[in-house]
C-alpha cells in the first residue's frame, strides 16, 4: 500500500518545477521619477498564469484595477522572473468575464512557457490538486509558493437563503444565473487570487483560485467569513480563450 502511494507523492515536486515558469504576478507599474509622489513604483495585486501563445495571461477580473493613475503614468503590468531578477512587462486586457471573475491579458516580450488546461467537467471530489502563486505579494515578493490539497466539494456559488429578506442583491443575481465552483481544503491568502489550480500528477489546470467573488455570495450571511478557499472551474477560462480567437 505504501508503494502505491509513492508515485503521486513524488509527482508534485516535478510538477511544480514545470508549473513555476508559467506563474506571474499581476499589478501596476509607474516610472521611477513619478513613483515617489504617487505611491510605490511597483504594486502587486494578484497572481496570473501563462496560457495559449505564451503571451496570454489568465487572472481574476477583480485583480485588475478599475482605473489607473494617468497623471503618474501608471500602467497595468505582469511581473515575470523570480526575486530580484524579476522584470515588469506592460499588459493589456484582451477579454474579461466579470460574472465568473476571470480575465485574459496580453503581454509583450518573449513568449513564456504556457500551462495546459484540463478538459472541462473532469474534476472529481477528492481529486488531489495544488496551486502556485504569490501570497501576500507586496510583502513576500516574487517568490511563488505552492499549496496542496484536494477538491472537497463541487458546490453552487450561492445557496438560497431561508428567507428572501436576507438575500443581498448579488445573491439574487447569482441565483438567477447559477454555476458551480470548487471548494478546496487548502488555504489561499491575499495575493493568491488568479493562481492556477492544477492536478498534482498531470499539471493540467482545472480552475482559478478565487475568494472575493464566492465570499460575496456563498458566505455573505457570515459575520466572519470562513477560511475556505474556492476556485472557478477552467471551463470559463476556455470560453474566454475561445472568444479571443
Residue ranges and their predicted role:
Residues 60-62, 134, 202, 211:
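Short, surface-exposed secondary-structure boundary micro-motifs
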Residues 53, 96-100, 154-160:
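Short, conserved beta-turn/loop elements at beta-strand boundaries and strand-helix junctions
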Residues 72-77, 82-91, 125-130, 144-165:
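Beta-strand/loop subdomains of soluble extracytoplasmic proteins
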Residues 5-7:
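N-terminal signal peptide c-region/cleavage motif recognized by signal peptidases
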Amino acid at each position: 500500500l505504501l508503494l502505491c502511494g509513492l508515485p503521486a507523492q513524488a509527482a508534485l515536486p516535478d510538477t511544480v518545477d514545470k508549473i513555476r515558469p508559467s506563474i506571474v504576478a499581476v499589478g501596476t507599474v509607474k516610472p521611477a521619477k513619478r513613483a515617489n509622489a504617487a505611491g510605490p513604483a511597483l504594486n502587486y495585486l494578484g497572481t496570473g498564469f501563462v496560457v495559449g501563445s505564451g503571451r496570454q495571461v489568465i487572472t481574476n477580473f477583480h485583480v485588475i484595477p478599475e482605473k489607473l493613475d494617468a497623471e503618474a503614468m501608471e500602467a497595468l503590468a505582469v511581473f515575470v522572473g523570480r526575486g530580484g531578477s524579476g522584470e515588469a512587462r506592460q499588459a493589456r486586457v484582451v477579454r474579461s468575464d466579470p460574472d465568473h471573475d476571470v480575465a485574459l491579458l496580453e503581454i509583450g516580450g518573449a513568449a513564456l512557457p504556457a500551462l495546459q488546461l484540463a478538459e472541462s467537467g473532469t474534476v472529481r471530489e477528492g481529486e488531489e490538486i495544488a496551486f502556485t502563486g504569490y501570497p501576500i505579494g507586496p510583502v513576500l515578493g516574487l517568490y511563488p509558493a505552492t499549496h496542496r490539497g484536494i477538491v472537497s466539494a463541487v458546490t453552487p456559488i450561492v445557496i438560497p437563503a431561508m428567507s428572501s429578506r436576507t438575500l443581498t442583491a448579488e445573491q439574487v443575481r447569482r441565483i438567477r444565473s447559477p454555476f458551480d465552483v470548487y471548494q478546496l481544503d487548502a488555504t489561499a491568502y491575499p495575493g493568491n487570487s488568479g493562481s492556477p489550480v492544477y492536478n498534482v500528477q498531470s499539471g493540467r489546470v482545472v480552475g482559478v483560485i478565487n475568494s472575493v467573488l464566492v465570499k460575496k455570495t456563498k458566505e455573505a450571511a457570515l459575520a466572519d467569513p470562513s477560511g475556505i478557499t474556492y476556485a472557478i472551474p477552467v471551463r470559463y477560462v476556455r470560453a474566454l480563450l475561445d472568444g479571443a480567437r
